[in-house]
């Protein structure tokens, strides 16, 4: 839970070698909900120029941020491939439509792979994505406001149970510190689905990912179940 799960420029700088070709950034983060600070984004972007490596920036949750602002490394470096889509911001997961942006050199190389892999997203999905992107954004703001309420609820309840939980700044996940290796199974047996932090790599051990992409009422119910049947059961 160091730095509230936020990647710092020092973490990257220490790992760069002459063999470094690319790094992946994910902010806001799945599974932690962390949002990187502007100064770290900019500093890592500067490193990509100094050491000539690519940043692959996964920004699928860029609009789901609470009380902060999203910063893309593409604003500060030309060595960036930005990945984004419509699944999260516009709740269009079933339509499977996304996009990337990059400089012309990288786009030409990416197109060679793309044109021999798939043709294009279906026209219905493309039209839906266009309307979502160009239309009123009121519903997006409402959804983010509702996610914030759900976040406040789940963070408060988990901390109240004794599970140290960082206040997520984006996306719709929390990553509480839970050492019990059997917690995920106990929770599932009680009817609450969670994901072991180890599923996201060795650094995730000792944590559990929980999503609050559900109704406020269902989250309350889930927290009651965990408290009664897993924590105190």
Residue ranges and their predicted role:
Residues 1-233:
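PLP-dependent class I/II
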């Amino acid at each position: 839970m160091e730095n509230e799960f936020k990647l710092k420029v020092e973490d990257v700088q220490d790992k760069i070698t002459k063999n470094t070709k690319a790094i992946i950034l994910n902010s806001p983060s799945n599974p932690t909900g962390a949002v990187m600070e502007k100064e770290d984004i900019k500093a890592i972007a500067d490193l990509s120029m100094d050491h000539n490596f690519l940043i692959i920036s996964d920004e699928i949750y860029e609009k789901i941020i609470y009380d902060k602002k999203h910063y893309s490394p593409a604003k500060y470096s030309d060595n960036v491939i930005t990945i984004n889509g419509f699944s999260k911001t516009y709740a269009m997961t079933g339509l499977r439509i996304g996009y990337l942006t990059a400089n012309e050199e990288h786009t030409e190389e990416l197109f060679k792979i793309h044109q021999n892999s798939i043709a294009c997203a279906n026209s219905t999905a493309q039209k839906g994505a266009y309307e979502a992107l160009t239309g009123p954004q009121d519903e997006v703001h409402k959804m983010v406001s509702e996610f914030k309420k759900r976040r406040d609820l789940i963070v408060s309840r988990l901390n109240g149970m004794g599970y140290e939980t960082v206040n997520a700044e984006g996306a719709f996940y929390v990553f509480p510190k839970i050492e019990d290796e059997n917690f995920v199974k106990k929770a599932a047996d009680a009817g609450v689905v969670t994901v072991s932090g180890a599923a996201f790599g060795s650094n995730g051990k000792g944590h559990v990912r929980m999503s609050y992409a559900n109704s406020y009422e269902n989250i309350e119910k889930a927290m009651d179940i965990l408290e009664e049947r897993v924590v105190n059961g």
